[in-house]
Each structure stands twice: as structure tokens, then as C-alpha cells.
UniProtKB/Swiss-Prot annotation:
Name of the gene this protein is made from: dppD
Biological role: Probably part of the ABC transporter DppBCDE involved in dipeptide transport. Responsible for energy coupling to the transport system.
Classification lineage: Bacteria, Bacillati, Bacillota, Bacilli, Bacillales
UniProt organism field: Bacillus subtilis (strain 168)
Residues spanning the membrane: none
Principal localisation: membrane
The name this protein goes by in its record: Dipeptide transport ATP-binding protein DppD
UniProt record similarity statement: Belongs to the ABC transporter superfamily.
Length: 335
């Protein structure tokens, strides 16, 4: 498979009045052409910060990439100037944000907002840009695009606004599309339509998608590969089948176990006890150790290396170490 993006040992920190928050700590993954790569995890785990780092949209005065590389077309995005990133952002790498209403300019028509990207990045004439806008609105399922492009965002429903935001992200035919919680603000019926739209667009354009979400139901429908993120680190990466049917990390198992089951009457929810670690002063060992039911002494002291279970499945957990069974049996486990 053709690799289109490589994130290597990414570290991002935020400077606050209370100290330095280590939001992302050593994140690494590759993205391949035409795939949907989902990053899942609870709020504050660093998944959105990772996507903002790729887009070059981190707050300039408080956030900083302190280490690592983001390689795209033989360029390290972390080393590019603002001017160079503006040439890539929107043209080669686009992003869909959570709330379509705040992502659109209420004072400009939909046609003007979609056409602006073509005029800037593709240097098209207004006539050619209008033709492209009509085609894109049709692709994302906007009825009567010739009339709708003259309208303003407030004249569209929430689902239609999200379709317009998707059209805006795809208008310049990017190589990578980052979707940050694209269905959070939508009801279940509209959510299903948008997810089906994602599948259709990917079939037609072969765009690579990074999906940022906490909704495992969404992941199960559209993702090819899944990364489970916790406290700024990758806990487990695998195919959708690996993660849903053969989870190895205790946090991944906890996430799946906490999802309500509609097929089991009266089934109790299984919460994950405890709280995430303080990222002002993260622990030296596994960040999930304090909440882990299989905790060992080594988990508190040293961060586990990556265990490769297959070509598609990697886990960062001491339980994958060959010595783990002996450690538990010898009484190294903590209560």
C-alpha cells in the first residue's frame, strides 16, 4: 500500500499558568492511500491535538511541537513556515470540524465559500470554479445545487450544513481528509446518512481519511484501521477486526466493555474505574496502570515497549511481554 503520511514520535505540549501540559507524548502511525484510519479515545487523550498538529493549527502562543516529525510528500510539516503550510492546508490536507455552523461564514453564500478555495489554490476562473462547486454539491447530495449555492448557511439544516463542510474540505481534491468528530452534532438518522456519504465519497475519490472520534459505533461502520489513544499515547493499533474482536490492551477492552449493549436485555454497564493521569506530571510507566485490573509493579515504573502481534496489530502493554505471566503468578500484581 502507498503511504501518504507518517507521524513519527510526535510530542506536543501546552504552556499554561499552572505549568506545562504534555498533551501528546510519542505518537507514531502511518496513513495509507484510500484508507480510513480512526483515532479513538476519551476526551483529553490528545486525539484532536494530534490532528491539529498535522494541519498546523495549534495555538501559536501556547502550544508547541517539542519533538517528532510529520512526513508528507517528503516534507516535515513540523518544520514548514506558516506560508508553506497555507499552501498545503485546504489543498493537499483538509479538515472537517465538529460544528458545521461555526465552520461556515454566516455572511457569505455557500457558493462563495466553496469557490474561494478553488480561486486561491487552483487559480481557476470564476466560471470554472462555479462549475466545480456545482459538481461538488451534487456529489455530497445537495439537491438543486444551482439555487442552493446562492444561499447562506442559516438557510440549511444541520445535516445539509455538514454536507457543505464536507464539500468544502473535498473541493480541492486533497490527498488527506481529517474528520474531527464529524457526526457529534447530528441526530442518529442524519449521522447514518453522513457516514454513508463518507463511504461513497471515498469510493469515488480514493482520499485517505483520519477519523477523530470517541464513538465506537461510528468506527465500526467506516474504519479500516483503528488507533486507541490514552493520556497522550497510543495504547493499541490494529485493523477494525483486531480491535473489536481481538483487543489486547486493558484500556481497549475497557472501552469496548463500557459500550451499552442493545442485544442483551438488562445488561449492566461496565465502567472503567479511576481517572486519567495528570498530564502536568505524567507517570513514568504505563499511563493506564492506576486503572488497570491486571496492574504489575513494572507497569508503574517503566513505559512498555511496542509488541508486534501481527503485521497489522501492535500493542503497548507489559501484559504482552513473555515474562508477564510469571510476574503475576509470583505476586508482583498490585491490588
Amino acid at each position: 500500500m502507498e503511504k501518504v503520511l507518517s507521524v513519527q514520535n510526535l510530542h506536543v505540549s501546552f504552556t499554561t499558568y499552572g505549568g506545562t501540559v504534555q498533551a501528546v507524548r510519542g505518537v507514531s502511525f502511518d496513513l495509507y492511500k484510500g484508507e480510513t484510519f480512526a483515532i479513538v479515545g476519551e476526551s483529553g487523550c490528545g486525539k484532536s491535538v494530534t490532528s491539529q498538529s498535522i494541519m498546523g493549527l495549534l495555538p501559536p502562543y501556547s502550544a508547541k511541537v517539542t519533538d517528532g516529525r510529520i512526513l508528507f510528500k517528503n516534507k516535515d510539516l513540523c518544520r514548514l513556515s506558516d506560508k508553506e503550510m497555507r499552501g498545503i492546508r485546504g489543498a493537499d490536507i483538509s479538515m472537517i470540524f465538529q460544528d458545521p455552523m461555526t465552520a461556515l461564514n454566516p455572511t457569505l453564500t455557500v457558493g462563495d465559500q466553496l469557490g474561494e478555495a478553488l480561486l486561491r489554490h487552483k487559480k481557476m476562473s470564476k466560471k470554472a470554479a462555479r462549475k466545480e462547486v456545482l459538481s461538488m454539491l451534487s456529489l455530497v447530495g445537495i439537491p438543486d445545487p444551482g439555487e442552493r449555492l446562492k444561499q447562506y448557511p442559516h438557510q440549511f439544516s444541520g445535516g445539509m450544513r455538514q454536507r457543505i463542510v464536507i464539500a468544502m474540505a473535498l473541493i480541492c481534491e486533497p490527498d488527506i481528509l481529517i474528520a474531527d468528530e464529524p457526526t457529534t452534532a447530528l441526530d442518529v438518522t442524519i449521522q447514518a446518512q453522513i457516514l454513508e456519504l463518507f463511504k461513497e465519497i471515498q469510493r469515488k475519490t480514493d482520499v485517505s481519511v483520519i477519523l477523530i472520534t470517541h464513538d465506537l459505533g461510528v468506527v465500526a461502520q467506516v474504519a479500516d484501521r483503528v488507533a486507541v489513544m490514552y493520556a497522550g499515547k497510543m495504547a493499541e493499533i490494529g485493523t477494525r477486526k483486531d480491535i473489536f474482536y481481538q483487543p489486547q490492551h486493558p484500556y481497549t477492552k475497557g472501552l469496548l466493555g463500557s459500550v451499552p449493549r442493545l442485544d442483551l436485555n438488562g445488561a449492566e454497564l461496565t465502567p472503567i474505574d479511576g481517572t486519567p493521569p495528570d498530564l502536568f506530571s505524567p507517570p513514568p510507566g504505563c499511563p493506564f496502570a492506576a486503572r488497570c485490573p491486571n496492574r504489575m509493579v513494572v507497569c508503574d515504573r517503566v513505559y512498555p515497549g511496542q509488541t508486534i502481534r501481527s503485521d497489522s496489530h501492535t500493542v503497548n502493554c507489559w501484559l504482552q511481554d513473555q515474562r508477564a505471566e510469571h510476574a503475576v503468578l509470583s505476586g508482583d500484581a498490585k491490588d
